[in-house]
Regions:
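Helix-loop boundary and gating motifs at the non-cytosolic
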Residues: 1-32
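Helix-loop-helix hairpin linking two adjacent transmembrane segments in secondary transporters
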Residues: 132-154
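Transmembrane alpha-helical cores of Major Facilitator Superfamily
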Residues: 29-33, 60, 126-134, 138
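Cytoplasmic helix-loop-helix junction between adjacent transmembrane helices
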Residues: 93-132
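Interfacial helix-cap and linker-helix signal at transmembrane-aqueous boundaries
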Residues: 14, 45-46, 145-148
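C-terminal ends and interior cores of transmembrane alpha-helices
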Residues: 60-83
Length: 154
């Protein structure tokens, strides 16, 4: 939910911060690219280190990265800084968000495959996919509602 929540506010946020449209697009894209690039790395790590350890590391990294992005954006709205600096901080934190998030679906799917009998795997994988889809829909919707309290709220 949180990773996609940013998508609903990036337009307003980028205008407020003076970012060009391509910079806003890059901030959204970089997390997806790093998600894609990091998934196989997290998959190998989950084979070596264990599924739960990788999931917890990924969730912790995601949480810290999201807090860093939020803090960076709040600071950028309150303290004058160059557009280049705002953009660099946004791209770095969004990249970290995508990179750490990649651990979650990779290790979750492996955990299901490792621990459920074959007759229950399909339903469990479908439930995981449905939960991910719900987050993709509900995250931006919730963030849009939270903007009534300001762009910092989501």
């Amino acid at each position: 939910m949180a990773m996609m929540a940013f998508v609903s506010i990036v337009g307003s946020l980028s205008r407020q911060l003076g970012l060009a449209p391509w910079q806003a697009g890059m901030a959204v894209t970089v997390s997806g690219v790093l998600w894609m690039l990091m998934a196989p790395i997290w998959g190998r790590a989950s084979d070596r280190l264990g599924r739960r350890a990788v999931m917890l590391t990924g969730f912790a990294g995601f949480f810290v990265s999201y807090c860093a992005m939020s803090g960076w954006l709040v600071a950028a709205m309150r303290v004058p800084m160059s557009v280049g600096l705002v953009f660099a901080g946004l791209v770095l934190t969004r990249g970290a968000i995508g990179g750490f998030y990649a651990a979650a679906p990779t290790a979750s799917q492996a955990l299901i495959a490792d621990n459920l009998p074959p007759e229950r795997r399909v339903a469990a994988m479908a439930s995981l996919g449905a939960a991910n889809g719900a987050g993709l829909v509900l995250g931006p919707a919730l963030a849009a509602q939270l903007t009534h309290f300001g762009l910092e709220a989501p």
